[in-house]
């Protein structure tokens, strides 16, 4: 089908939330009579937009959990000393956004609003309650404090008010009324020359997704969300930005390297690929127009794999049949995976070799250039693999980043071999058994029995209290 047909289909689109955000725990405050409070309860909009709501609700069917650490135990070593070494699952349906952030071992087991390892910002891509709290408290108020503070407030899953101005006349009239509900995302788009209010319809469709499906970090004392785009969106640009401000997410507990952890940079990688360059948006592929029982077109909010709706997605532009395109995508995915594993093997060795160098008496000055190579290698690897769809969005860029990561890791290991030789160590540094997730976690000193027990107690005692309080405050419908 011709490109203009796709554009015609877009014109009639009703866009709902693609990417979703976080929330905070704070007391509900009164608002000015001139201010309409963000409505975070998604079911409120079901009577007005029944097809969109029901398809959004169907994301609960995407319930399978895939344990990425069990699939690839090397990750435990690469993230040693960071919460991701405890628990990392592949993404599932957006209906599980709040559930998953509560249940992941990464958020710990806080007993009070002041406890826990993570800041409030960790809610920011999980719920329309985030937009509500930012409106009520301001950004500084929202970001203040620990993650547990948001428990009784952030209770509705990613939904309508994350991407739509649900209080607007346009939305009431059935128009998309797209909006950036996160002020920090609006500032980031302006930093790359894309102010939302001046963007075209198709740009806006991807920008609302880009509120969450991006790389970000926590800035300053308040741990506020910021996108590292001041120098640009390529991996080297963001690396330069982070290096200039001497930022690190954590220090690897084996190598003592100040590390960067990539998040989920789909907007950046999509922008670098052929679809992004031709303005084929996230919506075109993941939220196509479909017909309801009466033959009326609406935007499918069951965000998913384009191949599941091939006739409404890929076939709008491509002349190849489904099997042919699936074969191409599978080959690209395998190529990315194969190089990914090779880079990980080099990085695992580098972390243990760096530990051996420290143990042998290496100095900070001797280790600094080596740790910088490890930092840059793992950052480039991580930005490539953290975007789970890079084999589709930008396979060439993915391979380029992984190739660069391999070079940096090789540089680090060459320097380590020379340094270790000066310490009288010329044999290969042995690796512990990391053939399973459990063995790898034991190798870095994690007491997973205790961590899991504490989490289960938290889920049984604290989370029910959060939900009871939310119901009393009218934040949950049931």
From Swiss-Prot:
Pathway: Nitrogen metabolism; nitrate reduction (assimilation). Substrate binds at residues 216, 264. One of its GO terms (cellular component) is outer membrane-bounded periplasmic space. It comes from Salmonella arizonae (strain ATCC BAA-731 / CDC346-86 / RSK2980). The lineage of its organism: Bacteria, Pseudomonadati, Pseudomonadota, Gammaproteobacteria, Enterobacterales. The gene is nrfA. Belongs to the cytochrome c-552 family. Heme c 3 binds at residues 94, 209, 212-213. It catalyses: 6 Fe(III)-[cytochrome c] + NH4(+) + 2 H2O = 6 Fe(II)-[cytochrome c] + nitrite + 8 H(+). Its EC number is 1.7.2.2. One of its GO terms (molecular function) is iron ion binding. Residues 1-26 form the signal peptide. InterPro entries: Cyt_c552 (IPR003321), Cyt_c_NO2Rdtase_formate-dep (IPR017570), Multihaem_cyt_sf (IPR036280). Catalyzes the reduction of nitrite to ammonia, consuming six electrons in the process. Heme c 5 binds at residues 275, 314, 317-318. Ca(2+) binds at residues 215-216, 261, 263. This is Cytochrome c-552. It is an enzyme of class 1 (oxidoreductase). Keywords: Calcium, Electron transport, Heme, Iron, Metal-binding, Oxidoreductase, Periplasm, Signal, Transport. Heme c 2 binds at residues 160, 163-164, 301.
